[in-house]
Each structure stands twice: as C-alpha cells, then as structure tokens.
Amino acid sequence: MFAAAISLVGLAATVYLVLREAKAIRAQSGTVAKSALGWSVAFGLFQLFLTIWGAIGLVAQNEPLAFVMLILTNAILTGCAWASIARDRIAPRVFAFAKPDAPAPTGKLARLRGAFVGKPLVAAVLCLLLAGVFALLGMEVSSNHDFTWVYPLCILLEWAIITVLMVGLFFLFQRHGVAPAVLAFALFVLGIAEFFVITFKSMPIQPGDLSAISTAAAVAGTGYTFSISLFCVLSMGFTAIAMLLCEYAGLVAPHRQKGAANAKRMLLTNLLVAVLCLGGVTAHVTLIDYYNTLGITVYTWRPLESYWREGYLPAFISAAQSIKPPKPADYSVDDAKATLKKYAKAYDKSDAAKSDERTAAKEQFDSEKPTVIAIMNETFSDLSIYQNMRAGYEGPQYFKNLSNCLSRGKLYVSAYGGGTANTEFEFMTGNSMANLGSGVYPYTIYNMETTGNLAEQFKSLGYSTTAMHPNHATNWNRENVYKDFGFDQFLSINDFQGADTLRGMVTDQATYDKILELLDQNADPQFIFDVTMQNHSGYDTGLLPVDKQMHLNIDTTNLDAKTIEDGTLSDVDEYVSCIEQSDQALRYFLNALSKLDRKVVVVFWGDHQPFFPSKFNDKWFTNEDDATHQERLWQTDYIIWANYDVAGCDQTSEVDDLSTNYLSTQLMQLIGAPLTDYQKAHMTLRESLPAINSVGYEDASLRWALSSNVTGDDAAAAAATKAREDYAKMQYYEMFRDGKNVYTEHFQTEANETDPNLAPGTTKIK
C-alpha cells in the first residue's frame, strides 16, 4: 500500500503548490491561464491514477529501489504541475537568452552561443528535441528498461522519428505544445499496452495485432490482472517531462498575430514545415526498406528480442513493411486465373500427364488409396556436403543408401538455421517464399482458410487427416493454421506425455510409434503430417547419453579462431549425433512399415540446416559464384518411399532435385493421385524453373541465380524469368484472390517456446 500512500502525498503536494501559486498570481492582480491550469491538472491526474492503482494493489512494490522510484516519479509529476502553473514566472528566466532583445554573446564560443541567443524559435525546437528523448523513454522503459543491449543507431533512429513527428505537429498546430504533448502521452500509452501484452503473452505488439484490437478489447477483462511495474511508473515521469517541454516550447516560440503584417507568411511557413516533417517521416517509413537497407530484422521465432534490441518503433516498422504481400505488376484476378488455366492445360497435354506410367499409377491410386505420411524432420541435413566436414564424415548412411525410393534428391528450402514453419508452408500449400518477401512467416500473418493445401486435398479424396508435432500447439500459430487447413486432429505435446526424449525433446521414434498406433487404430486411408522435434537447436546442451555421442576430428587449419573457440565444433558433434539417431529411427520406421499389410507412402525431408554451416561454407568454398555458394546453405534432402510396388515407377531412387514448393506436387504425381490445377501448373513451371526458394532460382540449364541478381540473357534465363513472373501471379491468386482478405483473424495466443517441458514464452532471452 505504500505506493498509494506515496502517490497520495505527492498528489496533495501538487494540489497545495498549484493552489498556492494560483493564489500568488491573483494576489499580484494577475490571472491564472486556463491552459496552465489544464496542464497542471493533467500531471495531477497521473498521480491520482497511481494513488487509485496502488490502493487496489496493482502497483508492484517488491522491486529493488521501489521506494526511491515512487518518490522520484511523484516528485517529477509534482514539479511538472508546479512548473506549469508557474510558467509565467519560470519561462522568462529559463529562456532569457532567447528573447529577441537579449544581449549578443561575447567571449569564447560566442559564435556557437549566437546560434541560440535572441532566437526564441530555436529555443522552442531545442525543447522539442529534448521532449523527443523523454517521450522515447516514456514509451520504452515500461517494458524495455535495460538499454545496455539496445543497438545505439536503432535508438537514434527511433528518437529521430519521434522528434520529427513532434516538430511536425508543433508547426501544424501553429506552434502550440498540446499536439506534440498528446503524441508523447500516446507513446506512453503504447508503452503500457506493450508492457501488458509482454506480461500476458511474452510477445510484443506486432502489426498483425492491429486487426485484432476489437477481439483484444473483448477479452481484456477476462482473467487478466493489470498490475503495473515500477518501470511503468517511471515511464510516467519521463512522459510528464516530455509534455512539460512541449508546453514550454509553445510558450517560448513566437506566434502568429491576427492582423499582423507577417501573419499570412507565418501561417504558410508553419504549414510548410509541418508538411516537410510529417511527409518526411511518412516517406521514410514507406520508401526505405528497413529489412534489406537498414538491416533491422525481426527474429520471428522470438520477436521480443528484436523489439528490445532495435527499439519498438524501428522493429514495428520493419515488421509492418514485411507483412504486406507484394502484388505482381499489372495483377488482375482474371489474368491470374487465365494464367493458371494455361499452365494447367499445358500439363494436361504433356507426356507427364498422358504417359502409360501416370495412367497406371492413377488407376492404382484410385483403387488402393494408400495412406500417405509426410515427415518434416527437424533440422535434418547432410553436412557431408561440406567436404565431409574435413573429418571423413559421410552423413546419415541409412537415409543416403536407400535404393528403392520413388524419388530422392536435394531439396532447396527457404529457411536456414530456423524458420521451420516456412518450409512447412511451402510443402503444404505449394506456394514459395520467393514470392512473399523477406522476414515473412505466413502462418502467423496471412489468412490460411482459403489457401489450398494437402490436408484439404486428401480430405476431399476421403482420407482422415492428422497433424502431429511434439511441442506446444501454439508454436508458429499451428493450432489455428491446422484448423484452417482442415486437419481432423492435431496431436501436440499434450499427446506425447511419457514419450521417450533425447536432450529433453521427444524423439523421432516416439512420433513414428504414434503414427504406427494411428495406423493400427484405423484401416481407412489416412494423411498424417509429422513435424518432428528431436534435432532442434541448440547443440550445446551436453545432454546426450555417452553411447549416443559422436565426435568429428575436424581439420581446423583454415577456420577462424572464433569458430574454434566459441563452441561451434562441439555443436557440430552434438548435431551429427542427433542426425545419427534420426537415421536409425528412420530405419526402424520404414522397416516397420514394410511389414504392414496395407499400402503406405512416406515423404521425408529436412526443414533446414542448422545455424553454423555458414562458417565452414565461407572458409572452405571460396572460388565459386555467389548463387552456388549461398544455395549450399539453403538445401537439405528428401525421399519419397512406398512399402508397395507403385505402378508405373521403377523405384530405383532416381535423383530429381527440386524445391520444397514442388515437393507435394512431386509426391502426388508419382503415386497417381489427382492433381489440382495449381499442382498441374507446378509441373509445367518446373520445365523452365526446376527449383526456386527465397534466395534464388534454377533455370532449365541447371544454372542458379540469386533472386536479387538476375543473370543470363539466353533462352533458359528468359524462360525462367517469365516462369517466375507467372508463378508470382498464380500464387497471389491462390493465396489472396483479389487482395481484400489477406491477413489472418486467428492470431497466435502464446509466445513460441522451443522447450516442450516449459510453458510458452518461459525461456528467457539472453
């Protein structure tokens, strides 16, 4: 209760000082300005709020220096209230140097001082520059009070945005301080809202949340306790200082006088400055690419880290710029539909559609309806592509030596070191991240209800559909996306209680046992999508049993000293040990399926590489083009396997390298399943565009080019360019139709959390 007591005393002091000053003004035959009284009341209302909130126990009091922070904040609020009512006494003294008749400076630094002396407008702008600092603190400190890890340039950018907006509002409202003060208060409210959202969800307020404000308001009173921290209290103090500085800026600045000779010119000047400032900020946030140009990126798995390191406004702007899907040039729904129809017809006329092999596979599929199991194996990749890690490493041997696959090869993905959900999105929908821009995670942003996907497709064929992921259902918003996709059920960590674990993660084999259980319970055709968890980073846990540990004796001759010393080599050891366990689990699973008296197809692939191969790639592969160099990092491997003889297929593990967006089409083509028009278009696209991901694309001559650096002027390059343009058009139609219903209404309810043994958002950011 001492928070309420201190605030009540502060409020009493404010009332006393304001009344005393008002009495003194009247005693001198003066008049108390209503605006001055209004400012004082505003600061007093802060204290009244603290008194009430503290009285009902909603102000934290158990933090270090709580007593000091409460006294300091109330002293600031009382001081601001008094400075407002006494402004006619204080301002002339503080800004005496700015009076037009102030004596010219002499002595040292006279020229520098001359820039301020006798120039009241300059003094007003200086007040606003300082107000921007305190407004920034008023917004940030509530939830982000450790400034030791904030990037200085990002904070400087945030201050510049706030300050220029304040200056623009100041001049727009003809040099009055109310408008910039309202902005400072609005930023404070935003900071408090950010504090509550972080408290409840361990996530910041993000652009996508703006479309759910009404929903948030509806549930705000259900089960939440809106207790504020002492840093929120301190933010009030900073905001009050910002507001006071805005008030004083309005006092010192020269104002337009009606009827004066320069009144019209001053009006136009004010409006011009306002337009330049407000228009400049608008142009800045719309024309400058924060992600690619300024390097301000939001780490979407744990976005809170980005918002804390880069400042709320820069991170929010970067995220807002990224989420709007790029609309292809001259896009129209009719044109996109016509393009899709053209590509689908081209497939229908092709050998791939008319061949005897495809006909036989279709007849078999229609009569047999095999169960289809899709396994996206967490961080499964073959590091032997990096010169065998200069340690004789040969990769996962069982996986690499499977000789009876329908198809296998390199899989070019749109994720590296993380971003599982984007690889999943590409496989499930046939869409490519190459057409959605940088830093985008469709599961968390876009409306998936109308997006075609494999679960929906198999359900239309009479299949039951199951998704499983042995971690939190809320991660990457899967609980909502899987409903939108139409899965019949979603098995999450709650369905794997007591399952075997490795390094605290549910093992691959445990998920395979769950699949076998589902097959045993239901003889009807099923589509099962398994997103494993065993191999997730980090790789410095030290939790591997001794009998499962591998060690690579890597030749470190050409590696950086930092790579040798920062634990990367031990990370490699733990990672390849996990991959070995995945390889053995895959052997176990396929052997078990081989013994079943039912037809089963398995498509298995890795979602991305771990986070460290770039250190080896840059040192060991130095004389190659940029596209080849980069794509080595953005590839894993896939297999499509069946426990029966698929009609029309030799099943000799024919190599067919492709990208994740084509993988589901490849699966359906090989097993004889019906293709959607979009999948038929994929088959046609592959003739000119064999692979594409967020980094680059491959043309028909098997030449890679970076997406940002189109090369080649031959027929293959031209065909690939045309195919990319048509693909972007078709994908926009498939996802967004006319572009009026782009964003999801089913938002992620909890922060992402790697550790399935902890509540969402528990892991603290380092």
Question: What is each PLM-predicted segment?
Answer:
Residues V164-L165, S367-K369, L596-R598:
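Short hydrophobic "helix-edge" motifs at membrane interfaces and signal-peptide entry regions
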Residues K201, L210-A217, F316-K324, A336-S350, ...:
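Short alpha-helical interface patches
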Residues D351-Q364, A374-N377, D382-K766:
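Solvent-exposed soluble domains appended to multi-pass membrane proteins
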Residues A186, L210-I213, R309-F316, V333, ...:
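Alpha-helix initiation and N-capping motif
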Residues A81, I90, V94, L112, ...:
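Generic structural signal of hydrophobic/aromatic residues within well-ordered alpha-helices
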Residues K99-D101, A253-M266, D334-D366, Q521, ...:
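Intrinsically disordered, low-complexity coil segments
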Residues T282-A374:
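Membrane-interface segments at or immediately adjacent to transmembrane helices
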Residues M1-S306:
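Transmembrane and membrane-interface helices of multi-pass
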